[in-house]
Amino acid sequence: MQPRDLSHHVAYEAGRGIEEVARELGLDPDDLVKLSSNENPFGPSPKAAEAIREHADRVNSYPKAAATDLRGEIGDLLSVDAAQVWLGNGGDGALDYLARAMLDPDDGVLVPDPGFAYYGMSARYHHGQVNSYPIEKDDDFEQSPDAILESYDGERIVYLTSPHNPTGSEVSLSDVEAVAEGTDEETLVVVDEAYGEFADSPSAVALVEERDDVAVLRTFSKAYGLAGVRLGYAVVPGEWADAYARVNTPFAASEIACRAGLAALEDDAHVEKTVETARWAREYIRSTLECRTYESAGNFVLCAVGDGGEVAEAAQKEGVIVRDTTSFGLPSCIRITCGTREETKRAVEVVNDLL
């Protein structure tokens, strides 16, 4: 017996972890700086950590009340109805729910290239077809409606990323609307705002209330520092929000995750410190690194270093883990996550010595 044909599927390549690198190189994990996965350098919100401890003895219960409360709090924060908030096991889970709601077998999706691999992975899991639109280095990775619509061929879902991973470029609200206007009535435009807290531009949630063909993806993994508990959500138009009950995995957002999310939403100071430090680090990297860098609205900077794999491997041996972006189709670049001031300065010093 064998599984079905998975030849068109790909494995997700995540940034390397501290423990993995430490074992490989025989180093003390405490001596390593990990700036490869766009994680929060300050850890989770202290309020979220306390909530996890406080509710640890309640994980024998399914998270019905906690999930309901969290959907309500997110709805209040974004000025949408709680029913429009689709909680998932990370942003990936919310992407899966959107695919389940939208895709029949062989329906197409349009994804950015380079871009987040899970858009295509999720579509293929749901028997969809994956097409791409180019984001060109020569255009500073601009995500222009013209280029997107030129590649569009009636796909059921079009994915936009703002800020874009791994380049940091943004899509304006007017450009999101232009894409939505230029696609068919039955095409959903999904705006992935996983890094939205780090950007100055307004959220596309404003368009969700105006249209029935735009949805927004958000996560607690980045600015809130909760990557390990896996919590994200989609905000969908009210006209079809009730589809959630028919496509979600029951209780996929765990009791601990929901309680941590509720507490994190109350910790403005933690988010503000995280965002302020990321903005400082972006500017420091761009002004101090001795190679071309690209303007970023996320908590990371894409850097053209010549041979990304070689530089990333050498930096690792010096105790700094950065992301080789070869898996994104950018072998000449690395991506540096915005760390604390000390971590960021160390990373820039190490990379400069390698250039």
UniProtKB/Swiss-Prot annotation:
- Report the domain of life of the source organism: Archaea
- Mind telling me which Gene3D superfamilies this protein's record contains? Aspartate Aminotransferase, domain 1, Type I PLP-dependent aspartate aminotransferase-like (Major domain)
Q: Does the keyword Aminoacyl-tRNA synthetase apply?
A: no
Q: What is its EC number?
A: 2.6.1.9
Reaction(s) catalyzed by this protein? L-histidinol phosphate + 2-oxoglutarate = 3-(imidazol-4-yl)-2-oxopropyl phosphate + L-glutamate
Requisite cofactors:
pyridoxal 5'-phosphate
Record pathway: Amino-acid biosynthesis; L-histidine biosynthesis; L-histidine from 5-phospho-alpha-D-ribose 1-diphosphate: step 7/9
One record GO biological process: L-histidine biosynthetic process
Q: Which residues carry this modification: N6-(pyridoxal phosphate)lysine?
A: K222
CDD domains linked = AAT_like (cd00609)
List UniProt keywords, sorted A-Z.
Amino-acid biosynthesis, Aminotransferase, Histidine biosynthesis, Pyridoxal phosphate, Transferase
NCBIfam families given in the database record: hisC (TIGR01141)
- Give the family per the record: Belongs to the class-II pyridoxal-phosphate-dependent aminotransferase family. Histidinol-phosphate aminotransferase subfamily.
Identification of the protein by name: Histidinol-phosphate aminotransferase
Q: Which organism is it from?
A: Natronomonas pharaonis (strain ATCC 35678 / DSM 2160 / CIP 103997 / JCM 8858 / NBRC 14720 / NCIMB 2260 / Gabara)
| Gene transcribed to yield this protein | hisC
